Amino acid sequence: MKRPDYRTLQALDAVIRERGFERAAQKLCITQSAVSQRIKQLENMFGQPLLVRTVPPRPTEQGQKLLALLRQVELLEEEWLGDEQTGSTPLLLSLAVNADSLATWLLPALAPVLADSPIRLNLQVEDETRTQERLRRGEVVGAVSIQHQALPSCLVDKLGALDYLFVASKPFAERYFPNGVTRSSLLKAPAVAFDHLDDMHQAFLQQNFDLPPGSVPCHIVNSSEAFVQLARQGTACCMIPHLQIEKELESGELINLTPGLLQRRMLYWHRFAPESRMMRKVTDALLEYGHKVLRQD
């Protein structure tokens, strides 16, 4: 069985994390040539490329598997060393999360762990339909995803659902929907998407109003908080988690344009198995808080 040397594997990890050989060399305090030699050594060991030499470099399928292995080893080292780690450099935990969870429930859920444990978070924001891929590629050790099925050598638990409402300000509704929300009025009302792959708004309109994708004018804004601001100032109508706008709905600053209609996204927590002690703390915190504030039915 081929057993990689973890010093060389850390060179591969650094190239991916630092998005290039030069910065990886600086991170590892070695020469760029030494980084290249270590990766070539790994590739010779496995008889295949581990990096696609693009800008930035990205791991091949085998490279992804090795990076996932490295993540597990790092967490298990923390478990085995236990109290010997006390006072040392905080453990880095890379997690893939969707922007709406980050804007609503995730940080309060992690607050007790962050206050009690020597860890540093590296939160990688990705759409909930794609976060699991980051776990598959070994870029993170845990992911909040809508996928319910666990990857090989991983664990999964249900967190609960975010309910999305179709909302806008009252002046916006009076301007674009004077006779209510209809198929024809929606064609003129500007909306918002997180990125070009975000299909939340389109899926809602297609399901409830039979509008094909791409038929509605749409701003692209990579910020959950900006969705709320755009809706409040009367710039656009948006799909926003109910959890994020409870105060605005109660005050009347925002109104639900389609009462009785919503888009529900069930969320799941994925991570490598076996879990280290630190990851178990993270899991317990996420599940406990998620079960309190997210829909469970």
Curated annotation (Swiss-Prot):
Domain of life: Bacteria
GO MF annotations, alphabetized: DNA binding; DNA-binding transcription factor activity
Record bears the keyword Hydrolase: no
Keywords: DNA-binding, Transcription, Transcription regulation
Alphabetical list of InterPro entries matching this protein: ArgP (IPR017685), ArgP_gammaproteobact (IPR023490), LTTR (IPR050176), LysR_subst-bd (IPR005119), Tscrpt_reg_HTH_LysR (IPR000847), WH-like_DNA-bd_sf (IPR036388), WH_DNA-bd_sf (IPR036390)
HTH lysR-type domain span: 4-60
Family annotation (PROSITE patterns): HTH_LYSR
DNA-binding region in chain numbering: 21-40
Pfam families linked to this entry: HTH_1 (PF00126), LysR_substrate (PF03466)
Similarity field: Belongs to the LysR transcriptional regulatory family.
NCBIfam families linked: argP (TIGR03298), PRK03635.1 (NF002964), PRK13348.1 (NF009888)
PANTHER family attached to this UniProt entry: HTH-TYPE TRANSCRIPTIONAL REGULATOR ARGP, TRANSCRIPTIONAL REGULATOR
Subunit and interaction comment: Homodimer.
Cited HAMAP family: HTH_type_ArgP (MF_00513)
Entry function: Controls the transcription of genes involved in arginine and lysine metabolism.
This protein's name: HTH-type transcriptional regulator ArgP
Species: Salmonella typhi
